[in-house]
Swiss-Prot record:
Peptide chain release factor 1 directs the termination of translation in response to the peptide chain termination codons UAG and UAA. InterPro entries: PCRF (IPR005139), Pep_chain_release_fac_I (IPR000352), Pep_chain_release_fac_I_sf (IPR045853), Prokaryotic/Mito_RF (IPR050057), RF-1 (IPR004373). PANTHER family: LD18447P. It is found in: Cytoplasm. Residues 285-311 are annotated as: Disordered. Methylated by PrmC. Methylation increases the termination efficiency of RF1. One of its GO terms (molecular function) is translation release factor activity, codon specific. Belongs to the prokaryotic/mitochondrial release factor family. It holds the Pfam family RF-1. This is Peptide chain release factor 1. It comes from Methylorubrum extorquens (strain PA1) (Methylobacterium extorquens). Keywords: Cytoplasm, Methylation, Protein biosynthesis. Residues 285-309 have a biased composition (Basic and acidic residues).
């Protein structure tokens, strides 16, 4: 085990005592109370992990002392020797739990997310695959108790989506979906293929943390807002009022378009929310890319041009190329049932990279 500096743990315990005292004396103003309460809530979990780790450490030290004691009672030494493996395992688990809780936190992990799926190479088959991916994430979200709301969609001519953008609302959505960003590839025999040949097509997925107004400031003077009539598949107008909204952020060139609601006011609110999320994500991506380059991270780099996963239908196989994980559970993954197996493996690898970067591996 890589030692965790005791002075670092002592500093956390001291800070916990200070925050507790500041909240107890009642002198803090309302704003400070909110911040201190949030900090205390975060520190409580860390302090519990520290106490658990130190208790396990002391327990193992006591057992080792009993075994090594010259002239000690043979029966007690034998009993201690029996207890030693279990105590070592308990310390290992407490050490691992403490390491993970000390890792730098991604402030966006607790947020809801914006999910964008776009058909890539492969024509109609790519659009169908984009639709399959959207259903996979929708089913996964349902299993987690999250809510999915489509912001904008452009249907493919043979079904599926050329593009679909949705909000996924719930606690810690981004922490689970953020590793899905990238290029997804499918290998299967299309229904229209008479020779039984396998075709390859692709779709790209982008997952953004849903930004709130406090996360990023958007200057109204930097916006170009256009209204227009909503359009359906094929480009025809589907209503007579100009309810669709397109907002262009002039400094960055970021454009968002929303037409799902009949109300222009609601579409504008959704478009602003989507724009904030895109601008917030651009800031995060720049910072994350620099950090990822420093540690040569394979997981969580956020590179959306990277081919991250292949879905091979003839073999019933899903392969995540970042961690060389292969599951022969294609149907279960596409149904959202086994997606956690992939995501859990990605989270574990990401944590290992962070531990190495922090010198705690």
């Amino acid at each position: 085990m890589t030692p965790i500096p005791s002075d670092r743990l002592d500093a956390i315990l001291a800070r916990h005592d200070i925050v507790t005292a500041q909240l107890a004396d009642g002198s803090a103003d309302a704003g400070s109370i909110v911040q201190l309460s949030r900090e205390l809530s975060e520190l409580d979990g860390v302090v519990a992990a520290i106490h658990h780790y130190r208790l396990a450490e002391a327990n193992l030290a006591g057992i080792r002392a009993m075994i090594d004691e010259p002239g000690g009672d043979p029966e007690m030494r034998a009993l201690a020797a029996e207890e030693k493996p279990e105590a070592e395992e308990a310390l290992e688990q407490a050490h691992r739990a403490l390491q993970l809780i000390l890792l730098p936190k991604d402030a966006a992990d607790e947020k809801s997310a914006i999910l964008e799926i776009r058909a890539g190479t492969g024509g109609d088959e790519a659009a169908l695959f984009a639709g399959d991916l959207f259903r996979m994430y929708a089913r996964y979200a349902e299993s987690k108790g999250w809510r999915v709301e489509v912001i904008s969609e452009s249907e493919g001519t043979a079904g599926g989506y050329r593009e679909v953008v949705a909000e996924v609302k719930g606690r810690s959505v981004f922490s689970r979906l953020k590793f899905e960003s990238g290029a997804h590839r499918v290998q299967r025999v299309p229904d229209t293929e008479t020779q039984g040949r396998i075709h390859t097509s692709a779709a790209t997925v982008a997952v953004l943390p849903e930004a709130e107004e406090v996360d990023i400031v958007v200057n109204e003077a930097d916006l170009k807002i256009d209204t227009m009539r909503a359009q359906g598949a094929g480009g025809q107008h589907v209503n007579k009022t100009e309810s669709a909204i397109r907002i262009t952020h002039i400094p960055t060139g970021v454009v968002v378009f929303v037409q799902e609601e009949r109300s222009q006011h609601k579409n504008r609110a959704r478009a602003m929310s989507l724009l904030r999320s895109k601008l917030f994500d651009a800031e995060r991506t720049a910072k994350d890319s620099a950090r990822a380059a420093d540690r040569k991270a394979q997981v969580g780099s956020g590179d959306r041009s990277e081919r991250i996963r292949t879905y091979n239908f003839p073999q019933g196989r899903v392969t995540d190329h970042r961690i060389n994980l292969t599951l022969y559970k294609l149907e279960e993954v596409m149904a959202g049932q086994a997606l956690d197996e992939v995501i859990d493996a990605l989270v574990t690898e990401h944590q290992a990279e962070l531990l190495a970067a922090e010198g705690m591996a």
